Amino acid sequence: MANTSKVVKAARGHKFAVQNYSRCSRCGRARGYYRFFGMCRICIREMAHKGELPGVKKSSW
């Protein structure tokens, strides 16, 4: 319930644009957000391991 209310609160606009912040589209997490994917780092990692993100693969060097 608390997480849902945070997502709804973030969806509303603030008076000042600098106060707006992005949340993960899957889990609602505010930290570790990647704008390119629109998700947090944890959801990106999970989807990449499952093969749900085309063109993304684990790096090794």
Swiss-Prot record:
One of its GO terms (cellular component) is small ribosomal subunit. This is Small ribosomal subunit protein uS14. It comes from the Bacteria. One of its GO terms (biological process) is translation. Part of the 30S ribosomal subunit. Contacts proteins S3 and S10. The keyword Cell inner membrane does not apply. Binds 16S rRNA, required for the assembly of 30S particles and may also be responsible for determining the conformation of the 16S rRNA at the A site. Pfam families: Ribosomal_S14. PROSITE patterns: RIBOSOMAL_S14. Keywords: Metal-binding, Ribonucleoprotein, Ribosomal protein, RNA-binding, rRNA-binding, Zinc. Belongs to the universal ribosomal protein uS14 family. Zinc-binding uS14 subfamily. InterPro entries: Ribosomal_uS14, Ribosomal_uS14_bact, Ribosomal_uS14_CS, Ribosomal_uS14_sf. HAMAP family: Ribosomal_uS14_2_B.
